[in-house]
Amino acid sequence: YWLWGASPKVSAITIVNRCTILKPLFHVCSKHNILISELSKHEEIYEEIAAQYKGKRRIAGLQELVALSKDIGFTILDEDSLRKFSKYLVVNDSNQTPYIPPRIWAYQLERLETCIDDFLSISDGVISVFNSFMDNHNQTNENRKFINEQFNKYNVSVMLQKWTNFDPDTAKMPNFSKYLSMVSFASIAYIVNFSLMRISEAYLLRYGCFSKTLIDGQEIFLIHGVTSKTEKGEASWVVSPSVEKAIKALEIICELRFSCAKKIFGIKQDITDYKPYLHIPVFEPWGSGRGENERLEHIRSTIPYNNQISTFDKIFDPKELQITQVDFNIACKMTPNLDTEIYQVGKAWHFAWHQLRRTGAVNMLASGLITEQSLQYQLKHANTIMSLYYANNYYKLKFK
């Protein structure tokens, strides 16, 4: 079939790789005098077969067997068998993304939410300050008195001091832009925590991506975007109701910066028609690192989570991120190949965007409230076996 089937144009190395994937199945079946077409009925040899596989990429390749069943005329492993087989797999992959210990994960989530809530509490003032700066930036960019008057008038100064290293004695307009960028980062991080989307997918979210719908009388909250991991580019993620405020914060900042971009690029459309990326670059004329030389449709480069924490160093308290012995034990249990040079008791947890995705996957399955199929949908995986790899060891985590 691989030579003369629907897609005959394959290289020799591709054929070799595919045969390598199948070899353990045939070898163990032959050893036990079991027809390969009867493999689904013999779970007792799954563990022996699984022991011969290393790394998730070859394992994930088994999912092709399901799709080929009708074409080749028989089934080697069906969907249910793949799910059972995956439970015997021992992940031997030094690149397994670390699982964030619950205490640290909950702390970062709480701080992100507080940052967003604080911003929304002064959002009217933020809009007023932004518009005032737009009207007067040519004359007042270095007028510290005017800048502080605006910050104080609209109660923005308190939040700048709480969340950034703002000093009224050295107040500048770029301080304001940095605060907006920080809130934008916090909102994106909050969304990723609850949606499990890839950070690249979060960066592609556009204005107006959030919606609510009623299903069987229950209100469901959705984020609409794009993904490259499914046949259809368009995708939706089910999210917590609390994600709405993160979207709201992003929309406010997007509206302000888009108003500047319209003048720079001569855009005639309203924001609701244009639908720019929510995580929009800095376009305000006084902003540090403003995006005038960027195209509005340019997809921003992903900045590592830990780098963002260093840039916006008042979001998290380093002491709260220090790994305790309990944190370390949980991290090692969930990720046996954890890099203990990076993750040690007493050191601050080193964050990465993909950790939010894996941690969420583990927590969802461990809760017992989410099915494997629902997790697969949320992660935008082609098969449940891939999702189970993400949630590896979830059964070791107990929620009360």
Question: What does each of the following model-derived ranges do?
Answer:
Residues 81-400:
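Extended accessory and catalytic-adjacent subdomains in large enzymes
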